[in-house]
Every structure is written in structure tokens, then in C-alpha cells.
């Protein structure tokens, strides 16, 4: 999600008296904005059972609201200064009428839609106006400060310090110690001093313009250089790639790799840090060598389940996000226009960020039955990164006439070895020929770094060889996967164990024997010797033969086979996709064979059980 950004040629001159005022106001506003983001997402989280996708939907809304705030600031930029100040204060006043922060009441018909569609609407109805008002103030204040020719770029540091500070302090200090209701009240009251400081900044800017003789008219200046459509689209594309990658990596990590409270704050903090480094012109952490290596490495594991290597997968994903986003944001910083065009620059960056988020958080879940957005964005970012060759001498030879047979023969041989070898990537038992083919494809991809089209093609071949073909085959089969707001579900057979498995990422939701005589016998966590198995065996003794039993979570429906005559059972399942899978006898027969009339209530059991 783009933050307030700009070039940072900080002049070592006398600091004007109002610089501290503007810095403090921007810092406070940015801190409030990035306090509101995790706080409201945390407030909404229980309404959808704590699904990790809630944060992706939240990010999508925040990107859209940030775009609206930047667009508002850009529109006001053309107005007289007094009118700008008045309009911004009026917007804050109108937005304050929606406080305190709380979940808005929405039509019941909304919740009949996919959560990925209605959840951003819930965010907009609840905090949309106040978020836009606060998001606009940093851009406006930079514009006000720059009136009369002053360089506003040092205010960028204050904006990012507030954003990153709030984002890091929230999970460490605020969330563990302060209740959500109290947080919402404190945040709502904090808008008042922000409005007062904004008014004082506006008054200071107006007085300064009058003091230097400008009044409400701008001093004569050379016309700004025109900006073409190609450059605007370039800004948007360079912002869209990392923004979409942020959501894709966050989803991958929180669903498939590691599950931890508020873990999604970490990728967002890394994303913000790349903006700070890129626009500060810092030369630290050069991505030229590391980013292509990480792209190739992650391409090798994109279609592979994390399993026991989840920690290494998480570290790799975060490093990938950092170096790739840093490299692309540095290209974006190099394209920064003159200060008079700053608000337009911000609008296109915010618009690109929103487009990337829209694809990763909304379009992809509705369009794909698997997280194909991750490899798509990985290839797109590899092109946007435009890295130099890993070695110019090797690149010159490799793309010369003498290397032509090798240049095409290496990936062709790798592909041939992979195709002719048995594909057992799901079991992580690679045969020598298959492993050799993958090594050749990875080597060819590294040799192609610096040639964007060739690099992208080699990455796609590499991902196809490391599970991409199997993933597409599963999608084309039509009945092996299902995707919903709550995750990507996979139904597949394990011939070695003789069972059919039901998984979501690294989580096993159920298994059923493929042997007819054992098909209705509870397995996995629910077998007779498990804790649940022993408890269910004791139910008639403890609660009688007419016991009323509620089960939270349906999975494959395994526990339905513990139901005994006379008992009254109710299942609570939050995801309709899980209900459809469990009821489909072509997938699992627990419900059809043991309790075909089982009552299933769709929704969060914490809200529906009463």
C-alpha cells in the first residue's frame, strides 16, 4: 500500500519555524492512519471466524481509500490556499460525524455475497470517510508547506516514521494492553487534535503566503514539464507489482506457511520500509544480485507445500518481498517528477497500488481455484524489477551467436528431462532425471537475468516443472480443489496410505479410507483412541442416549459417524464451500453414510450457537 512518498534531497539549511509544526502534524496523522488499519481489521476479524483473508480484504479497502484521499488532495491542489484549508477541515468535520470507530450496520443481503466482495464494503461504510480525510492530510500539508518554493521533502521522513512506528507498536504495545473498545474511543478523540493542528498548519501557510506577497496567487514560475500517458502508466505499474505481491505473499504465508496472530503486520512493515529506503536514496541493501536469486529460489517452491520447512519458507517469502519491492520502488523513485507534480505522482502511485491489491485480493480469489496470483505476480515483478545481468561477461557470451545452441538447448533439455521423468513433486521424492531437469531450468533462468522477456519465460518453465503442471491439471479436473474466502481446499488420494485427504494449505481437515469396509470408520483426530473418540464413546453414559451435541467445524464430516440413534446433533461450519465438499458423496461419504439428515448451520459458531 503506497505511503506518502517523494524524493528526499534534504537541504542542510536553516529549518523554518513552522517545519516542526508541519512535521508533528504529518507524523501524528500517519500514526493515526496506521493505528486504525490493524485496529479495525482486528475488530472485524471475529465476524468471519478469524480468517487470514480478512486482512487481505482490509488491505484492499485501505489501498482504495488511500487512493481516494490522494485524489482529493490532488483536486484541492488546484484551489486557492484558503479554500483548500476550509475544504479539508470540512471533510474532517463530516467524517467525525461517523465516529466513534465501530462496525457499521449493513444490509443483511450483503452477507449473501462472497465475503471478498462485501467485506471491503463493510470497511467503507464503517471507516471510509474518516480514513480518506486522514489519508489526504499528509499530501495536502506537504503541498501547503511547499507554497512559495520551499522544499517539502523532509516531511516525508515524518510521514513514514509515524506510519512504521504505529504499525510496529500496535502488535507489541497497544493490542496486548488495551481493549478494542478503549482503542476505538481513544482513536476517535485523537482526531480532534489532528484537526486543530491541520487548521493551524493551514493558517500558517496562508499567513506565510501573505507575508511574502503571494496572497492567494502563486508566484510566477516556469511551466511544469508535461507528463505523458506512458510515464503515468509506468508509475502505476511500478506501484501495482509490489502492492499485489504484498497481498499474495501475505496470503501465502498466513494460510500455507505459518499461522500466528497479527503476523500480517510483518509483511506490511517490510513493504513500508522499502518505500523509506527507496525514496531516501539510500544505497543500502542493493537488490541487483539478491532479488533475481530470490525470485528463482521462490519459483522453485511456489507450488510446493511448506510442511516442516515452514520457517524457511516464511523467511524466504519475506526476503523476496523486501528485495523485490525495494528494487521496484527504487525505479519508481528515480521517476519522481518536479515538486509541482507531486500530488499527481501520488495519485498514480496510489491508483497502481489499488490495482495490484484489487487483482490479488478480489479478482484472483473469484477467478482462480488456487493461488495462481502468486506466480503471476512473481513473474510480473521480475519484469518490473528489470535487474542487470548477474555477470556482464557471461551475459555477453550467453546471448552471443556462439552460445545460441546452448541458450535454447539448456531449457529444452531441462524441460525434456522433467516431462519424461515421473512427476512425483507432491511427495518431494524427485528422481535423478527430474531433479537434473529442474537444475538445468534454474540455471537457464539465472543466465537469462537482465533480459526481461527471456527471464520471464524461463521462470514460467521453472514453475511449471516444480508443480505448476500438476496444479493446472488439478484445476482442469474440476473436482479436486475449491477456493473460498477462507482458503484453498484440496481433495486428493494418497495411494500409499489408502485414504482420500481434505486439506487447506498445511492443515488436514479430514481423511477417509478408500476401502469400502473401512470407509465409515472415523480417522485422524477422531479415531476411537483419540481424545474425541474416547469422549464420544462415553457420551451415552455421561449424558444419556438422547444427548444434544454441537460440533464446531465440519471438515470432511468425519465426526458424523460418531452419531448414535436418539442423539440430536448440530454442526456449525463457517464456510459454505466446506459444507458442499462434505455433503458431496463423490468426495466423502461420512455424512451420506452416517447422518444424511444432519443439521448444519452455516456461520461462526460463536455467534450462531445461541
Which positions does each model-derived feature cover?
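Alpha-helical transmembrane segments of multi-pass membrane proteins
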Residues: 2-610
Amino acid at each position: 500500500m503506497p505511503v506518502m512518498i517523494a524524493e528526499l534531497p534534504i537541504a542542510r539549511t536553516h529549518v523554518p519555524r513552522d517545519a516542526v509544526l508541519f512535521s508533528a502534524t504529518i507524523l501524528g496523522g500517519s500514526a493515526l492512519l496506521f493505528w486504525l488499519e490493524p485496529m479495525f481489521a482486528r475488530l472485524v476479524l471475529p465476524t468471519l471466524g478469524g480468517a487470514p483473508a480478512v486482512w487481505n480484504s482490509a488491505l484492499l479497502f485501505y489501498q482504495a481509500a488511500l487512493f481516494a484521499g490522494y485524489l482529493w488532495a490532488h483536486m484541492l491542489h488546484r484551489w486557492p490556499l484558503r479554500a483548500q484549508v476550509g475544504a479539508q477541515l470540512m471533510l474532517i468535520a463530516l467524517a467525525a460525524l461517523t465516529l466513534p470507530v465501530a462496525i457499521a450496520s449493513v444490509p443483511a443481503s450483503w452477507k449473501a455475497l462472497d465475503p471478498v466482495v462485501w467485506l471491503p464494503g463493510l470497511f467503507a461504510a464503517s471507516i471510509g470517510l474518516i480514513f480518506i480525510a486522514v489519508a489526504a492530510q499528509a499530501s495536502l500539508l506537504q503541498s501547503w508547506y511547499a507554497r512559495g518554493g520551499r522544499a517539502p521533502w523532509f516531511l516525508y521522513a515524518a510521514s513514514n516514521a509515524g506510519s512504521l512506528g504505529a504499525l510496529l507498536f500496535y502488535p507489541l504495545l497497544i493490542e496486548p494492553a488495551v481493549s478494542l473498545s478503549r482503542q476505538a474511543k481513544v482513536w476517535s478523540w485523537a482526531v480532534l487534535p489532528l484537526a486543530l493542528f491541520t487548521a493551524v498548519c493551514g493558517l500558517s501557510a496562508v499567513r506565510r503566503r501573505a507575508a511574502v506577497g503571494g496572497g492567494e496567487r502563486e508566484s510566477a514560475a516556469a511551466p511544469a514539464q508535461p507528463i505523458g500517458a506512458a510515464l503515468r502508466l509506468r508509475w502505476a505499474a511500478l506501484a501495482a507489482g509490489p502492492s499485489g505481491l504484498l497481498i499474495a505473499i501475505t496470503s501465502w504465508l498466513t494460510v500455507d506457511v505459518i499461522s500466528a496472530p497479527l503476523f500480517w503486520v510483518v509483511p506490511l512493515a517490510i513493504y513500508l520500509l522499502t518505500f523509506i529506503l527507496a525514496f531516501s536514496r539510500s544505497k543500502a541493501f542493493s537488490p541487483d544480485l539478491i532479488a533475481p536469486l530470490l525470485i528463482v529460489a521462490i519459483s522453485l517452491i511456489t507450488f510446493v507445500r511448506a510442511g516442516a520447512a515452514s520457517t524457511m519458507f516464511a523467511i524466504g517469502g519475506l526476503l523476496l518481498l523486501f528485495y523485490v519491492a525495494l528494487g521496484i520502488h527504487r525505479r519508481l523513485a528515480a521517476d519522481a517528477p518536479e515538486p509541482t507534480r507531486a500530488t499527481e505522482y501520488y495519485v498514480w502511485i496510489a491508483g497502481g497500488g489499488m490495482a495490484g491489491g484489487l487483482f490479488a485480493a478480489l479478482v484472483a480469489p473469484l477467478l482462480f481455484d488456487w493461488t495462481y496470483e502468486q506466480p503471476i505476480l512473481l513473474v510480473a515483478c521480475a519484469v518490473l524489477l528489470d535487474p542487470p545481468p548477474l555477470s556482464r561477461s557471461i551475459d555477453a557470451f550467453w546471448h552471443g551467436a556462439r552460445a545460441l545452441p546452448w541458450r535454447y538447448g539448456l531449457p529444452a533439455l531441462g524441460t525434456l528431462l522433467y516431462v519424461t521423468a515421473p512427476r512425483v513433486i507432491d511427495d518431494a521424492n524427485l528422481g535423478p532425471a527430474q531433479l537434473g531437469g529442474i537444475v538445468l531450468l534454474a540455471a537457464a533462468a539465472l543466465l537469462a537475468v537482465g533480459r526481461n522477456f527471456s527471464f520471464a519465460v524461463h521462470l514460467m518453465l521453472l514453475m511449471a516443472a516444480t508443480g505448476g503442471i500438476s496444479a493446472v491439471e488439478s484445476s482442469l479436473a474440476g473436482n479436486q480443489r475449491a477456493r473460498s474466502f477462507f482458503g484453498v481446499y484440496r481433495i486428493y488420494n494418497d495411494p500409499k496410505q489408502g485414504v482420500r485427504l481434505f486439506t487447506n494449505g498445511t492443515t488436514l481437515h479430514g481423511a477417509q479410507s478408500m476401502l469400502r469396509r473401512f470407509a465409515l470408520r472415523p480417522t485422524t483426530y477422531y479415531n476411537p483412541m483419540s481424545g474425541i473418540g474416547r469422549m464420544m464413546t462415553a457420551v451415552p453414559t455421561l449424558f444419556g442416549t438422547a444427548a444434544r451435541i454441537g460440533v464446531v467445524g465440519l471438515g470432511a464430516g468425519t465426526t458424523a459417524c460418531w452419531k448414535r440413534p436418539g442423539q440430536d446433533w448440530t454442526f456449525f461450519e463457517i464456510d459454505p464451500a466446506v459444507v458442499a465438499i462434505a455433503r458431496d458423496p463423490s468426495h466423502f461419504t461420512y455424512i451420506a453414510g452416517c447422518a444424511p439428515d444432519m443439521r448444519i448451520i452455516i456461520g461462526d459458531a460463536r455467534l450462531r450457537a445461541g
